[in-house]
A protein has these predicted regions:
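Short, acidic, metal-binding catalytic loop of nucleotide-sugar glycosyltransferases
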Residues: 22-32, 333-345
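A conserved hydrophobic helix/loop-capping motif in glycosyltransferases and polysaccharide synthases
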Residues: 3-15, 19, 26, 38, ...
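A conserved acidic beta->alpha catalytic loop
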Residues: 22, 39-48, 92, 325-327, ...
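Short aromatic/hydrophobic "clamp" motif used to bind/position activated sugar donors
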Residues: 85, 386
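Short, flexible, basic/aromatic active-site loop/helix in glycosyltransferases
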Residues: 119, 135-156, 410-423, 433-434
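Glycine-rich, basic loop-to-helix element that forms the pyrophosphate-binding segment
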Residues: 64-80, 364-380
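Conserved donor NDP-sugar-binding/catalytic core segment of glycosyltransferases
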Residues: 97-132, 393-420
Length: 478
């Protein structure tokens, strides 16, 4: 059984040299593994290290124009010849038995779906700061190993790209890294592999050291990028929307800003106390400061992603609608109306409460649970505004009224229209829907009886209800 060790690198030649040196000292024989350096368009010529390590290692360099880690890893995977793929990073220093432990695991469990997670810790020679110790503590901002037992299964969220291995054929059959992800590409791959049956097991003795000094500022910016990736993650996998801190992050970011705090200000506070000697009681205060900063940074990244334009021409309004039977074709009048409205700058998500959904053209179904479906649709939406309506109320005049009202009165935060059947249709800016927590609970009408007004008023908005209208004749419900 042969291993392929994939190392993505971008302008880290010195760190890569240390990593390759540690790989050259492995207890596993040279002919039992190959090392593929996946160069993401570096300027510092990492391939020049081949002369120093080519005799000690079965070493290859593959290069691509600068893109991201995911693309670099996929480029390396294309040339991998091993039975097992082991992912690590250029700033890691493997302990001598690391590869042997991964190889032995896969020998003991040759099943295609069996995968292994090793342990990562700071490099012993690295000078650790208070902040660096904090992010690998129970806070789990960097690594979450303290929640794992040695030899126990680990969930897909632990599929860390710095020390994990999987059978090459299983990886080839079930998807490689998604190159649209600039961050969290390893965990996103782990989720897809877990859906295909991957069983990840943790070995605490398979240690890979992280030789990377981390500053407060750099890690806070990293957390902003994680927040952006969470939104992308939920858009790609809507079934996870309720399990990711997207709504909570957006709410926290807004509330922190309203209190007069900023990321730069919190970073400055954290940096100022980094070198101070503190009493135990003061240490607890510093932990709260770190937690506030990193949570705020993550939430700010969520907000930025929610406010950013999506690729392509975004719709003006995303309309989210509970529909009738999803196992029957849409009635022709409704289908024609949706197609016409889509051409006019609207997009639609339809779902049915209480049962599994199926894909519909030109719409997308979102599954059985109303709140979950609304959250998932909001994350995937491309529109500047969200409109929640009933399928019998998909009148372009009504949608146009709601859009014009919310666009013309941003201070309202939300506009709604009470319909003859006692239902509400409402429109709200997409980022604001997240910042006020979305639909927290249902009340009144089983489908759309939620009330966002109180939360919006607490944020200083003045929600407005439009004059009641009578639904047009000739229902489009079909």
């Amino acid at each position: 059984m042969k291993l392929s060790v994939l190392i993505p690198v971008y302008n880290r030649r010195a760190a890569l040299a240390q990593c390759l040196g540690a790989l050259a000292r492995q207890t596993l024989g040279r002919d039992e593994f190959e090392v593929i350096v996946c160069d993401d368009g570096s300027d510092d010529q990492p391939e020049a290290l081949g002369a120093a390590f080519g005799s000690a290692l079965d070493l290859r360099f593959v290069r691509q124009p600068h893109a991201n880690r995911a693309a670099a890893l996929n480029t390396g995977f294309h040339v991998a010849r091993g039975d097992v793929v082991l992912f690590t990073d250029s700033d890691m220093v493997p302990t001598p038995a690391l590869l042997e432990k991964h190889r032995d695991f896969h020998r003991r469990d040759p099943r295609p779906q069996a995968a292994m997670l090793g342990h990562m810790d700071w490099y012993p020679a690295l000078p650790l700061t208070r902040f660096m110790r904090y992010i690998v503590s129970d806070s789990a901002w960097q690594f979450g190993y303290r929640a794992l037992a040695d030899g126990a299964p680990a969930t897909w969220g632990y599929f860390y790209g710095g020390n994990s291995s999987v059978k090459r054929e299983f990886l080839a059959a079930n998807g490689r890294h998604d190159e649209s992800f600039a961050r969290a590409e390893d965990v996103e791959l782990g989720y897809r592999l877990s859906q295909a049956g991957m069983e990840l097991v943790y070995d605490a003795s398979a240690v890979n050291y992280h030789n990377h000094f981390v500053t407060v500022r750099d890690f806070a910016r990293r957390n902003q990028n994680v927040g952006r990736a969470l939104v992308q993650f939920a858009a790609r996998h809507p079934e996870l929307t309720g399990h990711l801190p997207i709504f909570a992050g957006a709410v926290l970011a807004r509330e922190t800003e309203r209190s007069g705090l900023s990321i730069d200000g919190l970073i400055a506070q954290a940096e100022a106390v980094e070198r101070l000697e503190l009493a135990p009681a003061q240490e607890a205060e510093i932990v709260r400061l770190y937690e506030m900063l990193l949570s705020f940074a993550l939430g700010q990244g969520v907000r930025e992603a929610l406010q950013a334009d999506f690729e392509g021409a975004p719709a003006r309004v995303t309309v989210i609608v509970p529909t009738g039977r999803l196992d029957e074709p849409l009635a022709t009048p409704l289908r024609d109306r949706l197609l016409a409205l889509e051409r006019g700058g609207y997009e639609f998500f339809l779902f049915q409460a209480g049962r599994d959904g199926i894909a519909l053209d030109p719409t997308t179904s979102l599954g059985p649970e109303v709140l979950q479906a609304c959250r998932a649709a909001a994350v995937r939406a491309r529109g500047k505004y969200l409109c929640f309506a009933h399928r019998a109320d998909l009148d372009d005049g009504r949608l146009a009224r709601l859009e014009a009202a919310i666009a013309g009165e941003p201070e309202a935060g939300m506009v709604s229209e009470r319909l003859a059947a006692g239902r509400d249709a409402l429109a709200i800016p997409r980022p604001l829907f997240f910042e006020c927590g979305g639909f927290a609970q249902a009340s009144g009408d089983a489908a759309f009886g939620w009330r966002l007004g109180d939360r919006l008023r607490s944020l200083g908005y003045r929600p407005r209800e439009l004059a009641a209208t009578v639904p047009p004749g000739g229902s489009l419900a079909g």
